[in-house]
């Protein structure tokens, strides 16, 4: 029996099958962003550095996540001048989790998704103090 690799690869990608090697890679990464639909996580994006507000990298990641939804972009970036001045930051790689293609339309839901999307992968990896929230035990906050 001959196995058609192209068909198998297409089947796995279309059904959003996640392999254990992908899970291991995600677990070993330090900075991940969860892209959420209305009901569940759609994609996990891996970045080489943490997104921050002070250097506008947070806005670049958000611009990448919602670039295909004009209503959300207009809500998050009311000024086109500001939107155009921000550089879109693509992830190092992405692992697709589900086929949930619904977008939240409520502004509160969108903002909650954004604020709950940024995660640290490895707990034991050292993280610079300026990436950490205020608090005595950070791992309880982000886990």
From Swiss-Prot:
Lineage top rank: taxon: Viruses
Keyword set includes Transmembrane: no
Intracellular or extracellular location(s): Virion
InterPro entries registered for this protein in UniProt: Pox_D2 (IPR006791)
Induction comment: Expressed in the late phase of the viral replicative cycle.
Keyword terms: Late protein, Virion
GO cellular component terms attached to this protein's record: virion component
Pfam families per record: Pox_D2 (PF04701)
Cytoplasm found in the keyword field: no
Family, per entry: Belongs to the chordopoxvirinae D2 family.
Functional summary from the UniProt entry: Late protein which is part of a large complex required for early virion morphogenesis. This complex participates in the formation of virosomes and the incorporation of virosomal contents into nascent immature virions.
Protein name as catalogued: Core protein D4
